[in-house]
Amino acid sequence: MSEQKLALNEYLKTDSDYLRGTIKEGLDSSVTGSFSDGDQQLIKFHGFYQQDDRDLRNERKEQKLEPLYSFMLRARVPGGICSPQQWLGVDKIASTLTSSNSIRLTTRQTFQYHGIPKRNLKTIIQDLDRQALDSIAACGDVNRNVMCNPNPVESKLHEQAYAVAKKLSDHLLPHTRAYAEIWLDEEKLLTTEDETVEPVYGKTYLPRKFKMAVAVPPDNDVDVYTNDLGFIAVAENGELVGFNLTAGGGMGSTHGEVETFPRLADDFGFIKTEDVMKFAEAVMTVQRDWGNRSNRKRSRLKYTIVDHGYEKFKAEVEARAGVKFEPKREVVIGDRGDRYGWVEGVDGKWHLTLFIESGRIKDLPGQTLQTGLREIAKIHKGDFRMTSNQNMIIAGVAAEDKATIEGLARKHGLLGQVLTQTRGHSIACVALPTCPLAMAEAERYFPEFIDHIDALQAKHGISEQAIVVRMTGCPNGCARPFAAEIGLVGKAPGRYNLYLGASFEGTRLNKMHRENIQEADILAELDTLFGRYAVERDAGETFGNFTVRVGVVKAVIDAAKDFHG
């Protein structure tokens, strides 16, 4: 059998001189607001994507103008933690160097900027560098931002878990100096042709993106099973002793292509804390060497495990790590939501979790969220923690400072809004107008859609029940819709596929119930199901489990076989 032809991106990476390409030349060109096609792939490794305003696309075409190009830049913030001083720097960039004048908290515990003209990219990256922040490997075929449960209660355990997440992020960063040379004006050194430039990645990096998360049970806010590689903390007497390792999760799929599917990770066993780096590097290098480099739609680790088999993959990881997995330790995986309002930590410090709808931090009439966080940052002595539910925690507040912090939060609309259980458990991706992959609205439409869900729950007397609802504009799954009890995935303008049946805890995927339907049909379907749920549910039964038990959808046990079947 002849060897399959490599995907174009593989040649681009090989010929890029370790991610340099012609990015510098493209940056210096004022002829266009765009980069070349090849460099558009390479800039992802530097932390940003080229986009354009799709609302204006047709109008500009009629005017014989090129699309209104701009860039989305995503920062690397392992565990989502930054200082108040860093936040002030982040805020200033949004206010002065982006057309969106906003900050977007993401579903991977970091922030991103939208509406950056090409001419401002270098200034922004240099300004971030002054705050000890960067966007290296926030996108691209590398290990992305490492998530970690921000657990504001078990402060000591969080600190230990966060240290592991930070070490993972640092250890698995690309070694190339391309970022420093292009954006920070570091003098280029003579590059070598051997693999010592990238001892872990090599010249072609990974076949596809690679996502990693650290969970601290019982919380599963990081949706650990949706990640390529997950570490579920195991504690004894409040001390971290190791992790249950999971591998092979991922949300992305392609409409109409059944060989692509979302998947939850497999459990592989327990590892000691001191062996985390060995196993992380082993899993990642197996994916580097075994992953599909011909078809990018089948390049994620989940497909590598499916294609090669669980046992073969496990044996290879153990061989490369030089350590065997121990039997998985029993842990309880629970809520994926955030604890809103004030929570006291074991150290006596207080933590205020603020709900940020769809993660968009912007000043609006009656809700000056951006100004509010800026004012809090000016006086706060603790840290800011971004959550994977797109919210913000003002962490480490002394008891005597609570009233001042709360007063500012209420003054600027960061506190005091009516927040139902379901709204508090719901997230959406950005989608239109900036995401080039979006087929339908998400962030702009989602608040209105949740209003309808809230009204239906109130109608049937089930408002007390949290339901995990997620919406994306396409099936790439940035807001993890396939792990939602109610998942809506864009198919066309105003039309979505409706998915039901995921577990509340994030341990089972959902399954498509209705295809390509509009709002009225979605709400009518949910109206009927909520009515049944109100009278037929068992005590303590969640909505996702109910839809499976009564046969609305079948449980997805093995995604490769039954997600589409």
From Swiss-Prot:
Residues the entry annotates as binding siroheme = 478
Q: Which cofactor does it need?
A: siroheme; [4Fe-4S] cluster
- First-tier enzyme category under EC: oxidoreductase
In its UniProt record, which GO terms are filed under biological process? cysteine biosynthetic process; hydrogen sulfide biosynthetic process; sulfate assimilation
Please list the disulfide bridges.
none
InterPro entries, per this entry?
Answer: CysI, NiRdtase/SiRdtase_haem-b_fer, Nit/Sulf_reduc_fer-like_dom_sf, NO2/SO3_Rdtase_4Fe4S_dom, NO2/SO3_Rdtase_4Fe4S_prot, NO2/SO3_Rdtase_4Fe4S_sf, NO2/SO3_Rdtase_FeS/sirohaem_BS
Q: What does this protein do?
A: Component of the sulfite reductase complex that catalyzes the 6-electron reduction of sulfite to sulfide. This is one of several activities required for the biosynthesis of L-cysteine from sulfate.
UniProt lists the family membership as follows: Belongs to the nitrite and sulfite reductase 4Fe-4S domain family.
Q: What protein name applies here?
A: Sulfite reductase [NADPH] hemoprotein beta-component
**Organism of this sequence:** Shewanella putrefaciens (strain CN-32 / ATCC BAA-453)
Q: What is the lineage of its organism?
A: Bacteria, Pseudomonadati, Pseudomonadota, Gammaproteobacteria, Alteromonadales
